[in-house]
Amino acid sequence: MKSEDVKLGIERAPHRSLLRALGLNTESFQKPFIGIVNSFTEVVPGHIHLRQISEAVKEGINAAGGVGFEFNTIAVCDGIAMNHAGMKYSLPSREIIANTVEIMAMAHAFDGLVFIPNCDKVVPGMLMAACRLNIPSIFVSGGPMLAGRLRKNDQVSCVDLNSVFEAVGQVAKGQMTEEELLELEKVACPGCGSCAGMFTANTMNCLTEALGMALPGNGTIPAVDSRRTQLAKSAGQQIMQLIKDNICPKDIITPDAIHNAFSLDVALGGSTNSVLHVMAVAHEAGADFSLEQINRISDCTPNLCKLRPSGPYHIENLDQSGGIGSVLKELKPWLKNDARTVSGKTIGQLADAAPKADNKVIRFASNPYSPKGGLAVLFGNLAPNGSVVKRSAVAPEMMVHRGPARIFDSEELATKAIMGGKIKTGDVLVIRYEGPKGGPGMREMLTPTSLLAGMGLDKEVALITDGRFSGATRGAAMGHVSPEAAACGPIAALQDGDMINIDIHNYKLSVELSDEEIQKRLANVPVFEPKIKSGYLKFYTENVTSASTGAVFKD
């Protein structure tokens, strides 16, 4: 056992003395040491209840003959960090999470790890750490929040955080009163858990099942459901079996597992952020995978779910309809069914054991919403290295669009123009210098897209950015444009009025300019000057790579 480095031999007497100070006895030193990587915090609704999850994990570890040690890492709430300087720190927190877990696991010689994430950057940060450390590991998330219930005119409707973001646009356009907004604000987020739709956090927790790193139910069992606590206890027990069998993350997260994750992703219509994060996980796992492969998967994999923001359903509905297992069951013809999972069974075996889909929340593969998946990576002279769009959330009339560019060099400038009613039907908003380096931190453009949707412009206006979008974004929103403006990508050459062509059906994103004109303009673009010159974001700006490679650090 790896933990023998801190507990066996005469020279480890000082180490054992310190461990005895924790309450361990001689018998404890014969057992595997398990690190419980918690991300509890009192400022994130998705993480406020994770102490309960951790206690259940400890029970499972103890019952199976191990010794559990809980430690924490950080967690950022993207909703609270949205639309101010805090959003610059959200994506960069992913690398901090991976690094802190690496430090704690190596310093204390754990034999295995149980990861307890829930929200956006915590899941991929922990997955990256698991691959980097490559010791037996298992994930159990905190689970999704229930949808809120809003009573209006004797009718009750389901609402969520995205409802509030879009309502701000309705208020700005005079379609909702501030009093009505307040009533919505009070009920949209009814308690603990990751925000209730197929937003980034829930996308990543669902994909963790398809990657093989979590037990069935991880992605969909609600945070307040007792099955969530039972799942946590089972994860604590299962880590002991993984240690016994010496099954490590790189045995599980292979190119086949990445294929399965993206197959599930496009079937669900998951968040565009998943592309960024799964590519980063693949990088840490040494699993070679390209953006072009995502399009090949999406071309042949049906879109089976319309979950918020793409449709009316929430994660609790997905769970009631069979959960991720039922989706995988429909996807079996497109999966790498022999891929391993932490359950000890293959992904195909788990799919076989799942209940049949209901053909409502989870459609049959023979009756999909679309024969093609919900995500697409667009290429062209505006995005030579790719740009990501959630096509399942794009209105049919915007799948092909041609319009004049409206250039904004920050999210704030674009938001001001939208709120001021200065955006016209047909416009293509371009928000640049918001990429990994340029932002820095690749902020989410949820406020601009929510305002457009709330004002009813999501079927008339497109938005392109080298920044990111929230999983709650809907509309013709193309993000992750690579290379970014700060790296002198073609997006930096755009001027107001340039005609932009979007063809999601054929994976194209281009500007009606010759290559010579683009290069001529780029030659006159000033050298990018970092916006932040101290602290962690200075380090981040100097070391982060392109969104097309997952925005990981330079090797």
From Swiss-Prot:
It catalyses: (2R)-2,3-dihydroxy-3-methylbutanoate = 3-methyl-2-oxobutanoate + H2O; (2R,3R)-2,3-dihydroxy-3-methylpentanoate = (S)-3-methyl-2-oxopentanoate + H2O. One of its GO terms (biological process) is L-valine biosynthetic process. PROSITE patterns: ILVD_EDD_1, ILVD_EDD_2. The active site is at residue 470. GO terms for molecular function: 2 iron, 2 sulfur cluster binding; dihydroxy-acid dehydratase activity; magnesium ion binding. InterPro entries: Dihydro-acid_dehy_C, DihydroxyA_deHydtase, DiOHA_6PGluconate_deHydtase_CS, ILV_EDD_C, ILV_EDD_N, IlvD/EDD_N. Pathway: Amino-acid biosynthesis; L-isoleucine biosynthesis; L-isoleucine from 2-oxobutanoate: step 3/4; Amino-acid biosynthesis; L-valine biosynthesis; L-valine from pyruvate: step 3/4. It comes from the Bacteria. Mg(2+) binds at residues 78, 120-121, 444. Keywords: 2Fe-2S, Amino-acid biosynthesis, Branched-chain amino acid biosynthesis, Iron, Iron-sulfur, Lyase, Magnesium, Metal-binding. Gene3D superfamilies: IlvD/EDD C-terminal domain-like (3.50.30.80). Binds 1 [2Fe-2S] cluster per subunit. This cluster acts as a Lewis acid cofactor. Its EC number is 4.2.1.9. GO terms for cellular component: cytosol. Its cofactor is [2Fe-2S] cluster; Mg(2+). [2Fe-2S] cluster binds at residues 119, 195. The modification N6-carboxylysine is found at residue 121. Belongs to the IlvD/Edd family. Functions in the biosynthesis of branched-chain amino acids. Catalyzes the dehydration of (2R,3R)-2,3-dihydroxy-3-methylpentanoate (2,3-dihydroxy-3-methylvalerate) into 2-oxo-3-methylpentanoate (2-oxo-3-methylvalerate) and of (2R)-2,3-dihydroxy-3-methylbutanoate (2,3-dihydroxyisovalerate) into 2-oxo-3-methylbutanoate (2-oxoisovalerate), the penultimate precursor to L-isoleucine and L-valine, respectively. Homodimer. This is Dihydroxy-acid dehydratase. It comes from Dehalococcoides mccartyi (strain ATCC BAA-2100 / JCM 16839 / KCTC 5957 / BAV1).
